[in-house]
């Protein structure tokens, strides 16, 4: 039997369920965006290999598009999340994007770059949000660059962590550890 909550979510989603444009029909990456991301990655530290920065940027944009097609993104992020949670779409929650982006870029075996993950905990009306971060090898995630394809519904957002004013990012392991501690105390 369908719960009231899922019925209400479905009712809210139906009017906009077919409003979006399929990702394969959207315009591609804006001119200069790959180069801008490559420059942002390279600017993290002097020893970042320019070829690796360029390759990482190119892959990040291409993989965002591939995931948007795979996840069947046609809606804004929160509408898509509702569809995933209702079983209408296969994947596409923010942590799916972060996990898949991290896995893809880690597969490159970069020598001067590495991936990490961060979470912005929900406060007030906001929900938790996860993202992938690319950093210079051995550096702290706070000096890295946010790679967030979820935020704009299958269009890659990127910015240095310190310049991303929309979210307060914390290392994923710190947030998950804090939650585990809270469960232990409550449990």
Per-range role (PLM):
Residues 106-156:
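Hydrophobic/aromatic-rich core segments of domains that either
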Residues 82-116:
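Mid-length scaffold segments of soluble, non-membrane domains
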Residues 36-82:
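Secondary-structure boundary elements
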Residues 1-15:
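N-terminal secretory signal peptides and thylakoid transit peptides that target proteins
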Residues 139-187:
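A recognition module on extended beta-rich or small alphabeta surfaces enriched in W/G with H and D/E
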Residues 19-39:
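Bacterial Sec signal peptide processing site at the extreme N-terminus
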Residues 46-53, 87-98, 125:
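Solvent-exposed, acidic/flexible segments
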């Amino acid at each position: 039997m369908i719960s009231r909550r899922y019925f209400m979510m479905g009712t809210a989603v139906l009017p906009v369920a077919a409003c979006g444009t399929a990702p394969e029909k959207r315009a591609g990456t804006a001119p200069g965006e790959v180069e801008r991301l490559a420059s942002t990655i390279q600017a993290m530290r002097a020893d970042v290999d320019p070829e690796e920065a360029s390759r990482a940027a190119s892959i990040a944009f291409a993989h965002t598009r591939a995931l948007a097609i795979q996840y069947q993104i046609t809606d804004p992020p929160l509408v898509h999340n509702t569809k995933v949670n209702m079983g209408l779409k296969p994947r596409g929650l923010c942590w799916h994007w972060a996990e898949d982006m991290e896995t893809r870029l880690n597969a490159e075996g970069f020598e001067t770059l590495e991936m990490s993950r961060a979470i912005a905990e929900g406060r007030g009306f906001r929900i938790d949000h996860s993202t992938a971060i690319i950093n210079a090898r051995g550096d702290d995630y706070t000096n890295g660059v946010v790679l967030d394809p979820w935020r704009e519904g299958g269009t890659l957002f990127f910015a240095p962590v310190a310049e991303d004013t929309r979210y307060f990012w914390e290392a994923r392991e710190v947030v998950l550890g804090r939650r585990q501690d809270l469960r232990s105390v409550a449990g």
